[in-house]
Swiss-Prot record:
InterPro entries assigned: IMP_cyclohydrolase (IPR010191), IMP_cyclohydrolase-like (IPR020600), IMP_cyclohydrolase-like_sf (IPR036795)
Keyword Hydrolase in annotation: yes
Name assigned to this protein: IMP cyclohydrolase
Protein family (similarity comment): Belongs to the archaeal IMP cyclohydrolase family.
Amino acid sequence: MYIGRFLVFGKTEEGYPFVTYRVSSRSFPNRLAKVMDDDTVSILPKELEEMFKNPYITYNCVKLVGDVAVATNGSHTDIIADKIKLGLPIRDALSYSLLTMDYEKDDYNTPRIAVVITKDEAYMGYVTDSDVRIKKVELEAGKAYYLGVYDACKITEHQVISVTGKTAEDLTKFVMDYEEFEKPVTAATVLVKDGFKLATL
């Protein structure tokens, strides 16, 4: 099944919250996730001149703000993080940012998807050309929701998978290797365990 770029978030079998963002692509297999600093993971083209060809190629997919982790499929990562930094509640920061940025104005009207987690709370949201939704969800150890841009842009108990892995590296590899979702390119994970742990693949 091809669901494009997607987020997987839940709890490890040990009960630690995490979120993984994976780029999947039929057309652009030359992307990489790179840890830029202690608070940011970016998606970059391997050939840097490509970033000028499309406004949706280069973006921060992960931002850490205090005790909050934001993960998305686009430049709205920064908007959500900035609003949280200014003191907005997570739900309001998600709502404002998704409505303001709207879906991507590309050939596919690609949805914007987002997940925000702390050690105690988890929110997911999306905006499409016909819908917008934000929801706080309860996480269960060993289980994770997934939210994708193609044929999986919905918030439902039917989009839950079992997960294995104890470290951020384990979880990144698990999501990259998850065979049901086709065309893996790169991925990044934030694990909430004694602070934040970042990993990319």
